[in-house]
């Protein structure tokens, strides 16, 4: 059985975000656990903090690198140097970080379960409708086959039967016709209900995606707040923590919540903005060229079905024109500029377009069969390349892939990254936070610095570094021994121009 949910872009986006949220939740729990043990181990000084730093480092190894994880890595290093922290710090951490985090994580877990249940419920509706269509189709095919057999029996035995026997067969044929029409209408209604259940499921995925995205933003903000609280308490301790705090301060000053949220959006983005909805098309007994039905009989039965589709297409087209007029009025009139009304109207437009595409695909398929029967060229339609078949035992099924825009706007990179004038300035700085351009300035490393990301430089005490760029968040960009990268400004001192020339010549 084909799964109608597998290739849905909405489903892929939601699952990707759900997986990302699970990793984020695990990371947040690891951080909370580390802070709790940090608070408990404060009274045991260096030994306890050393073990905790190792635990934190392991937790960070399985976490995606970003601003927050880098800052927490520096927090791990500060734990190694803060062996003399006393009980007051532990209580402050427990009260201001651990307790709020537990509350937020507990609330988010309940919300995520509720969102998952809602998605699963609507997904089951899509699958059930899909299965009902196939079941109704099989039933209609069998009834049509029996009806045709009875029809041919009546036609072939008109001359050999008495009037009474002939009337009996005609009554039986009439009942069979009524039953067939009822089953045909039931199958048609189930087929038409397919698009509404599909839309409901996709809309639920979209809404649940937005809700889960807000939870992730809240979690990132919580981690940032915890990190800032942690920094403030560390700053209260004396001269013994000065060197350690310099390191963690540099890392915290580099934290950019918006950058992490952008990373979240990029991590969960899909590769293609194209969304294809798969819908079953109505298949009829009359379409199969292998059945014993004659051509004229086929044509007489297909034409009413085609007429029904044409009437529905005309109605849907009129509805579309009306929606377009309303949408145009909303956009042009200031009194109707309500964003929610426009969003609702766009949703109705999307629903109408999907219904119209389904009707046109069904109409094209039946028109093509009728054209073959009447020995004339097949009609042309864009959906001809989007209709596919697959076989299941003795039956074949037809479905159409309808391309639709994703209503959820994922990454608006063009707007967020382009300059105000719309042109790329080749002479502009690669980062908006650059405060000055340093042309061949030199500086000397005062402390050893171990790089934690690929774009950072390793420094040894006494190294002479060429500075290319100074940034306001406390990090500079330079080169050392042929390698370029970032390094903390607090770890170096600038050399005067003359000293820099001497160091260069040496």
Curated annotation (Swiss-Prot):
REM-1 domain mapped to chain residues: 292-372
Biased composition annotated in UniProt, kind: Low complexity: 419-435
Modified residues (Phosphoserine): 114, 479
SMART domains attached to this UniProt entry: SH3
PROSITE patterns: F_BAR, REM_1, SH3
Domain spans labelled SH3: 438-497
The entry's keywords: Cell membrane, Coiled coil, Cytoplasm, Cytoplasmic vesicle, Cytoskeleton, Endocytosis, Membrane, Nucleus, Phosphoprotein, SH3 domain
Subcellular localization, as worded in the UniProt entry: Cell membrane; Cytoplasmic vesicle; Cytoplasm, Cytoskeleton; Cytoplasm
GO BP annotation list: endocytosis; negative regulation of DNA-templated transcription; signal transduction
Residue ranges of coiled coil: 160-230, 305-334
Record's note on what induces expression: In F9 cells, by retinoic acid (at protein level).
Every F-BAR domain range: 1-260
Membrane topology reported for the UniProt record: Peripheral membrane protein
GO molecular function annotation: DNA binding
Gene Ontology cellular-component annotations: cytoplasmic vesicle; cytoskeleton; nucleus; plasma membrane
Note: Seems to repress its own transcription.
Domain statement: The SH3 domain mediates interaction with NOS3, DNM2 and WASL. The F-BAR domain is necessary for membrane targeting.
The protein's assembly and partners: Homotrimer. Interacts with NOS3, DNM2, WASL and CAV1. Interacts with DAB2. Interacts (via SH3 domain) with DNM2; this interaction allows the recruitment of NOS3 to dynamin-positive structures.
Function: Multivalent adapter protein which may decrease NOS3 activity by inducing its translocation away from the plasma membrane.
Listed name of the protein: Nostrin
Native source species: Mus musculus
